[in-house]
């Protein structure tokens, strides 16, 4: 008998958020913690990624990452 781990919707979304932070960090050639701190400073995770999860997770990884970087830079400029 095969035991499968069942993840909650929140766990799935948090996994997606983590992958977004990792991809932004890799693309910008910065540490994961720096990318997270920048995104957190403008509330991007709570105000953009989580509320738009359904749309974002259906996009290609490349488009999501490019969009996140563009959004991050615009939001940082407006602070």
How would you describe each model-predicted region?
Residues 1-79:
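C-terminal alpha-helical interaction appendages
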């Amino acid at each position: 008998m095969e035991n499968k781990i069942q993840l909650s919707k929140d766990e799935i979304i948090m996994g997606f958020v983590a992958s977004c932070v990792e991809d932004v960090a890799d693309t910008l050639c910065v540490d994961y913690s720096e990318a997270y701190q920048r995104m957190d400073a403008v509330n991007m995770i709570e105000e953009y990624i989580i509320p738009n999860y359904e749309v974002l997770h259906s996009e290609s990884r490349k488009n999501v990452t490019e969009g996140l970087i563009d959004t991050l830079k615009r939001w940082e400029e407006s602070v």
